[in-house]
């Protein structure tokens, strides 16, 4: 087999591949063995039709497509390996010659992984992140904990205030007509949560239990139900009950309720401070890692093929669909609620997809430039770490991974980012 690679404009090129006649004949033989099993001919058992009779009746050309299906993948795979190229999309195959007892000649037009011209990636200036935890930070965390431990109690007197929960009946009308989904009874509405249409909750503030009011609002222009989008509406609202948050007293008992591992409020505050310090340190480390990667990517010169962006977009949509399924939703419902579709979703994701592809290509180039490798021991250590994290046997982790090659590549990327951080200014 012979292979010739011709680079065209951009990231596109053409492989011209010639396969020996012997391989061609072998593929035709294999195609016959496959096809003859499906043919019933009087006088012969199924699959036992003689080759000469088959060729006389159907013509040898009837085997060519099946033969090509057999020979092309192998020939193309060997050709890209021989040419040392990395296609990022399906090839455009053009058969120039295919017949028995002759060499197969075909071309494959392919888009290949782009060349990355690295810019400055050592000594990158990154902003230092403040990790000091103040007394105010601790108090705010304590207040958040107190809020989470709060109980809702009925407000016997007074009116609805921001932060209260109003138990309401409501019915909405557009142009004097009730609409589907616009009615609810004994609905607990947290005031200030932004759950309802903009302007609704603010008009409930100041009402007393037992009071009714017509709330005038307009549906947002981008509202998911197209028949309501942008239209004014009137909601008839009745307040049944007002509930307010009753915060627990900050004392040792509260501390023990909040965290069984502490005995006093002071111990709880100390633990909160430690957690905040660890959180800020972790956040700072992530920020620095993200920043050096983005700077290195921005400094590089790359002409990214559209095929790579589309592949990444497909991956991102699959990831998004998985997250939706975990929330009991699917893409069709999401499109319905948001008034969007697959094309609009991909358009929203496109910038992030371009960024992901650029970063991946730059990190791969840095790995190559700095000869970054991972050892078998490092891969084994990572597998053991995963086993401990998930509470699974090491063999089960290996079986779940299938191959550790992808894990090894992930470790290389991690090392590349470590290198950028260690060499930052």
From Swiss-Prot:
Reaction equation(s) it catalyzes: [protein]-peptidylproline (omega=180) = [protein]-peptidylproline (omega=0)
Entry's EC annotation: 5.2.1.8
GO CC annotations on file: cytoplasm
Coiled-coil residue windows: none
GO annotation, biological process: 'de novo' cotranslational protein folding; cell division; chaperone-mediated protein folding; protein transport; protein unfolding
Keyword annotations of the record: Cell cycle, Cell division, Chaperone, Cytoplasm, Isomerase, Rotamase
GO molecular function annotations of the record: peptidyl-prolyl cis-trans isomerase activity; protein folding chaperone; ribosome binding
Domain PPIase FKBP-type, chain residue ranges per copy: 163-248
Gene3D superfamilies xref list: 3.10.50.40, Trigger factor ribosome-binding domain, Trigger factor, C-terminal domain
Pfam families recorded: FKBP_C, Trigger_C, Trigger_N
Main location group: cytoplasm
Localization (cell): Cytoplasm
Family label: Belongs to the FKBP-type PPIase family. Tig subfamily.
Notes on the domains: Consists of 3 domains; the N-terminus binds the ribosome, the middle domain has PPIase activity, while the C-terminus has intrinsic chaperone activity on its own.
Chain's role: Involved in protein export. Acts as a chaperone by maintaining the newly synthesized protein in an open conformation. Functions as a peptidyl-prolyl cis-trans isomerase.
Protein name: Trigger factor
Organism of derivation: Bacillus cereus (strain ATCC 14579 / DSM 31 / CCUG 7414 / JCM 2152 / NBRC 15305 / NCIMB 9373 / NCTC 2599 / NRRL B-3711)
